[in-house]
Amino acid sequence: DAIDGQEILMPVVSGADLWRESGRYDSVDVLVKFKGRSGADYVLNPTHEEVVVDYVKSVLETYRQMPFMVYQIQTKFRDELRARAGLIRTREFIMKDAYSFHETQSDLEQYYNRCHTAYERIFARCGLKNVVSVMSSTGDMGGSVAHEFQLVNDMGEDTLFLCDCGFN
């Protein structure tokens, strides 16, 4: 909340129409799809871009309301080919995700940096000293830039190359 976000809770299940409208219904491999009793198509939301865009269309009336950010901490479902990392990353997991809307690319980039710094402060308050930020793939969910915060330890399947220059 310190970075001007608003916590909300979005639905675990959404109608498939939102996903069809975005073009991702048939392109995202990890979607859990099912039919309701009436025969309607539904999706267990592995992420909420479709839902939040639909929501923002109804609440943002002018660009003057930007930047606008909502976030949630919620259970996610992804039908991944190979669930990994034991209990940390299975097909069902809890994730904090945030969605922000900006008038300019420059404002988006500045806000992204504010979010990144906020996470670093959270980890410091928790006493986590071995957390590093690494560039990562946007994966099935898409996007242009992504970072992951990883706790350096001997377990897990990722290999990190670290140097004193700060480029990880």
What are these regions (language model features)?
Residues 1-168:
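TRNA-recognition modules of translation machinery and tRNA-sensing kinases, especially anticodon-binding
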